[in-house]
UniProtKB/Swiss-Prot annotation:
Its EC number is 2.3.1.222. There are 2 Zn(2+) ions per monomer; Zn(2+) and CoA bind inbetween the 2 domains in each monomer. Monomer, when purified in the absence of the encapsulation peptide (EP, residues 1-27). The EP may influence oligomerization. It comes from the Bacteria. This is Phosphate propanoyltransferase. Its main location: other. It is an enzyme of class 2 (transferase). GO terms for cellular component: bacterial microcompartment. Disruption phenotype: Unable to ferment 1,2-PD, impaired for aerobic growth on this compound. Belongs to the PduL family. Keywords: Acyltransferase, Bacterial microcompartment, Metal-binding, Transferase, Zinc. Induction: BMC production is induced by growth on 1,2-PD vitamin B12 medium. PANTHER family: PHOSPHATE PROPANOYLTRANSFERASE.
Length: 210
């Protein structure tokens, strides 16, 4: 195989890889807890795994809490593990209206100036002073995925949701690159409902910047 043919073949393979479907993960409301807050809410009860998630080492725990806001509450909100350094609550816009909380759109971990909420477990209550957000839609990927897709950590891209009669293009999708991450797009339940993505055939496809 001559050099020109080899280069052409490589370009074709890479183009096909850039068009491959991106797995879609729909994130229902959930919480992340610090070790200190977990011990206050579940004293003497070790965190236990209910279901492994796609991202390595992450899982849905057996433990749940009730979120209590100024206007309402949401029960059976799942804890995701492992425990973190700072507690965080991720809800949808619809959830925020139910609770009566003005939760800002943020990337995970960007909690400065966010509202708090009361957490109620079967054993205790905890007033979280801050940490409630509506999560920015994003795509997790490895450095190799980023190289193939020609994107970098922190980029904003546009993504088409396909596999359903409705479909939708989402702009302002953040790229999150980490060596221990697998390729997966995360959207919340409001976004999934709008795109008709609440079915096993739905997937995402990168269509351009922003």
């Amino acid at each position: 195989m001559d050099k020109e043919l080899l280069q052409s073949t490589v370009r074709k393979v890479l183009d096909e890889m850039r068009q491959r479907p991106i797995p879609l993960g729909v994130s229902n409301r959930h919480i992340h807890l610090s070790a200190q807050d977990y011990e206050r809410l579940f004293p003497g009860h070790p965190i236990s795994e209910k279901k492994a998630l796609l991202q390595p080492g992450q899982y849905a725990a057996e433990q749940t809490v009730t979120l209590v806001g100024p206007k309402g509450q949401l029960k059976n909100v799942r804890l995701l593990g492992p425990l973190r350094s700072v507690s965080q609550v991720e809800i949808s816009r619809t959830d925020a209206r139910t609770l009566g909380i003005a939760a800002p759109l943020r990337m995970s971990g960007n909690l400065k100036g966010t509202p708090g909420i009361r957490l109620v477990s079967p054993f205790a209550e905890l007033e979280l002073p801050s940490g409630v957000i509506v999560a920015q839609r994003h795509i997790h990927m490895s450095p190799l995925d980023a190289l193939i897709l020609r994107v970098s950590h922190g980029d904003m891209v546009s993504v088409a949701i396909e596999g359903d009669d409705r479909g939708l293009i989402f702009n302002n999708v953040a790229i999150r690159v980490s060596p221990d991450m697998r390729l997966e797009m995360h959207i919340d339940t409001d976004e999934a409902n709008a795109a008709g993505a609440d079915n096993p055939h739905a997937f995402a496809r990168l269509v351009g910047p922003r």
